[in-house]
């Protein structure tokens, strides 16, 4: 019996007769030979139908195929060094499952709005395929890394009674007779998990009502947020560096084909796998920007152009450490050597992609945290449960958050973050 295989496994079946179920992405003919561009969800490659090698019925069936037709093929796998994939199949038999007209995404240039309107179909194309495969590798690498480091996966709620950072960028939801908000971060609940289980990570969707059309912003995105009990900031930075190096290494090892589809130079990513990220003090980053002629002073936060300039000075991610307390959230621990600073850090991705991680040592002292909540103008009652984490067995602890789509955008070298998620939610888009 002929074995049913995926396109991705073609290399294991060279010169063997196999069966596949596929979709058609494109077709061309030179009279007695029909070239079918095929996909099956694991890879793309070419199928060749030669009139002299198949029955008339099979040849006519191949001629009738329309874009995105679905069908079974039987044939023999051969090497094809001219293609990205490296293999093709000489088809001997074909059985059509579905073959309809009118597929809207043709083999021509389409505008972004048209493609986003048809995102449910655009996902089938080569570029989105490559990005989603890399996204999947990064997800698997994340789970593998943190399990090996002794973390457990911990699930934070989506409905929130209050905002974790006192922000106004919240989606309000009517929760029966009460007000609720969609989560902007699982961090505070992650800290509760760390006090129960030592080391945890949350990984899920978050929501921010940012009225921005910028290339780095969406209203719904995924965050990966570890929290670690008994850990100071320097140890947290070590984990962040190892994690990012491991994740990029996994992409380089498992997604060579997808990187080729995207035209992404893997050598630009390789330095990240070596670690050794510079830990640049905020003060020095300000001086660097001032020396470059930028209008910025101590106490200002960095804009995207500032982060882009800093990132271009390094061949791998860089930590910017110890920001002023005036521009970071209330839950961070102040630097004992300089109380105007928090023990915090952002990871800035290379090639102008800006911030992808943000983290800090959390304030572990009950009275100090209570004061910082009051100074931030927040309702103490809303945060009493959070203060309890310090009141009962509080310990030094640290954590960070990674913007998953921002990190994907850098690794894949995307122009806009909307490509990094299957169905982007933007200020002007909620469908499909």
Swiss-Prot record:
Keywords: Aminoacyl-tRNA synthetase, ATP-binding, Cytoplasm, Ligase, Nucleotide-binding, Protein biosynthesis. Its EC number is 6.1.1.22. Its main location: cytoplasm. PROSITE patterns: AA_TRNA_LIGASE_II (PS50862). It is found in: Cytoplasm. GO terms for molecular function: asparagine-tRNA ligase activity; ATP binding; catalytic activity, acting on a protein; nucleic acid binding; transferase activity. The keyword Transcription does not apply. CDD domains: AsnRS_cyto_like_N (cd04323), AsxRS_core (cd00776). Pfam families: tRNA-synt_2, tRNA_anti-codon. GO terms for biological process: asparaginyl-tRNA aminoacylation. One of its GO terms (cellular component) is cytoplasm. It comes from the Bacteria. It catalyses: tRNA(Asn) + L-asparagine + ATP = L-asparaginyl-tRNA(Asn) + AMP + diphosphate + H(+). Homodimer. Belongs to the class-II aminoacyl-tRNA synthetase family. This is Asparagine--tRNA ligase. It comes from Lactobacillus gasseri (strain ATCC 33323 / DSM 20243 / BCRC 14619 / CIP 102991 / JCM 1131 / KCTC 3163 / NCIMB 11718 / NCTC 13722 / AM63). The lineage of its organism: Bacteria, Bacillati, Bacillota, Bacilli, Lactobacillales.
């Amino acid at each position: 019996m002929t074995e049913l295989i995926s396109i991705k496994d073609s290399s294991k079946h060279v010169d063997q007769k196999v069966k596949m179920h596929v979709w058609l992405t494109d077709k061309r003919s030179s009279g007695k030979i029909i070239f079918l561009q095929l996909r099956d969800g694991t890879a793309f490659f070419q199928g060749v139908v030669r009139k002299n090698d198949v029955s008339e019925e099979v040849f006519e069936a191949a001629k009738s195929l329309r874009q995105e037709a679905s069908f079974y093929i039987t044939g023999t796998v051969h090497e094809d060094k001219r293609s990205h994939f490296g293999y093709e199949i000489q088809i001997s038999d074909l059985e059509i499952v579905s073959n309809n007209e009118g597929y809207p995404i043709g083999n021509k240039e389409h505008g972004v709005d048209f493609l986003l309107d048809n995102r449910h179909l655009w996902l089938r194309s080569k570029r989105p395929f490559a990005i989603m495969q890399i996204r999947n590798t990064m997800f698997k690498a994340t789970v593998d890394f943190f399990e090996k480091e002794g973390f457990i996966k911990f699930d934070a709620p989506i409905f929130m009674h209050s905002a974790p950072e006192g922000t106004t960028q919240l989606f309000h939801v009517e929760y029966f007779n009460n007000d609720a908000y969609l989560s902007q971060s699982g961090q505070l609940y992650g800290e509760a998990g760390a006090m129960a289980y030592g080391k945890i990570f949350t990984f899920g969707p978050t929501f921010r009502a940012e009225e921005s059309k910028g290339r780095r912003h969406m209203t719904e995105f995924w965050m990966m947020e570890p929290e670690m009990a008994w850990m100071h900031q320097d140890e947290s930075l070590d984990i962040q560096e190892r994690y990012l190096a491991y994740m990029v290494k996994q992409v380089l090892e498992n997604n060579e084909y997808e990187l080729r589809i995207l035209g992404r130079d893997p050598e630009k990513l390789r330095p990240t796998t070596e670690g050794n990220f510079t830990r640049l003090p905020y003060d020095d980053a300000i001086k660097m920007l001032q020396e470059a002629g930028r209008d910025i002073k101590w106490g200002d936060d960095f804009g995207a152009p500032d982060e882009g300039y800093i990132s271009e000075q390094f061949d791998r991610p860089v930590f910017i450490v110890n920001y002023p307390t005036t521009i970071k959230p209330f839950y961070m621990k102040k630097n004992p050597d300089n109380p105007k600073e928090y023990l915090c850090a952002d990871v800035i991705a290379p090639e102008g992609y800006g911030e992808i991680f943000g983290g800090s040592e959390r304030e572990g002292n009950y009275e100090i945290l209570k004061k910082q909540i009051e100074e931030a103008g927040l309702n103490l009652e809303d945060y009493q449960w959070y203060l309890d984490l310090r009141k009962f067995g509080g310990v030094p602890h640290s954590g960070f958050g990674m913007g998953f789509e921002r990190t994907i955008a850098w690794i894949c070298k995307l122009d806009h973050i909307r490509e990094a998620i299957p169905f982007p939610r933007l200020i002007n888009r909620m469908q499909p």
